[in-house]
Amino acid sequence: MIKYTIDELFQLKPSLTLEVNFDAVEFRAIIEKVKQLQHLKEEEFNSHHVGHFGRRRSSHHHGRPKIKHNKPKVTTDSDGWCTFEAKKKGSGEDDEEETETTPTSTVPVATIAQETLKVKPNNKNISSNRPADTRDIVADKPILGFNAFAALESEDEDDEA
């Protein structure tokens, strides 16, 4: 097989014909060998760099991918109040084993306080199908209205007398 230097490759023209003794079979074998080596290198790289679900990072931001976390569990009771349930750290079996190994004494057991978060209820849960009692309704308009003309007339009458 003929080997060329970089300068010789730049001087070659694509329109030139191949040499008479060019061996295409050997050339194809070299190409297949290079393809196999590249495939093995990719497999080795992928086996060591499996992080972030095997995705490659894009080159325009050079940052780590953002991994979405599961939403916290929120329960809504019959009154419409939503309560956040914090994730318990550790398993309950470990706590039971620790209490069994300690001797029975008057040592207070530390408990983990569960944090709760109260949220305003939805307006749809507040509405009612029952009509409101008329005695509970506060009137917006005043019962006794003020008439300015009547007040002016009454002042005039007081002055005349």
UniProtKB/Swiss-Prot annotation:
Subcellular location as annotated: Cytoplasm
GO cellular component: cytoplasm
Residues with PTM Phosphothreonine: T99, T101, T102
Key words of the record: Cytoplasm, Initiation factor, Phosphoprotein, Protein biosynthesis, Protein synthesis inhibitor, Translation regulation
PTM remark: Phosphorylated by casein kinase II complex (CK2).
Modified residue annotations for Phosphoserine: S78, S91, S154
Function of the molecule: Acts as an inhibitor of cap-dependent translation. Competes with eIF4G1/TIF4631 and EAP1 for binding to eIF4E/TIF45 and interferes with the formation of the eIF4F complex, inhibiting translation and stabilizing mRNA. Binding affinity for eIF4E/TIF45 is 10-fold less than that of eIF4G1/TIF4631. Required for induction of pseudohyphal growth in response to nitrogen limitation, probably by regulating STE12 translation.
Known partners and oligomeric status: Interacts with TIF45.
Protein name per the record: Cap-associated protein CAF20
Organism, scientific name: Saccharomyces cerevisiae (strain ATCC 204508 / S288c) (Baker's yeast)
